[in-house]
């Protein structure tokens, strides 16, 4: 098992070796299971995935954990960059 604090800041890479960004937060359900990772996108990923970069700050997507293939020095996804285009941006409540 890995501590949540050790996940934050880890790089997130697609299965085709595209650097998506890094984990900024995790979302949990009522049973304390991680349901989504919030990934702060790189500038390149923001453009590649079709998001508009805000004047200040970054775009963050909410990626369901079933898309994670492996956790090590980096987070490896089971999707390629094209398959990420349907992942929504995280909206603040």
Q: Predicted regions: what is each one?
A:
Residues 1-93:
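Peripheral interaction segments used for macromolecular assembly
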């Amino acid at each position: 098992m890995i501590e949540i604090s050790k996940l934050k800041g880890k790089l997130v890479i697609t299965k085709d070796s595209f650097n998506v960004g890094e984990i900024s937060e995790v979302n949990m359900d009522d049973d304390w299971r991680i349901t989504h990772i919030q990934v702060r996108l790189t500038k390149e990923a923001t453009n590649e995935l079709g998001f508009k970069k805000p004047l200040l700050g970054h775009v963050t997507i909410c990626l369901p954990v079933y898309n994670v293939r492996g956790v090590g020095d980096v987070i490896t996804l089971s999707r390629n960059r094209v398959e990420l285009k349907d992942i929504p941006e995280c909206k603040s409540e």
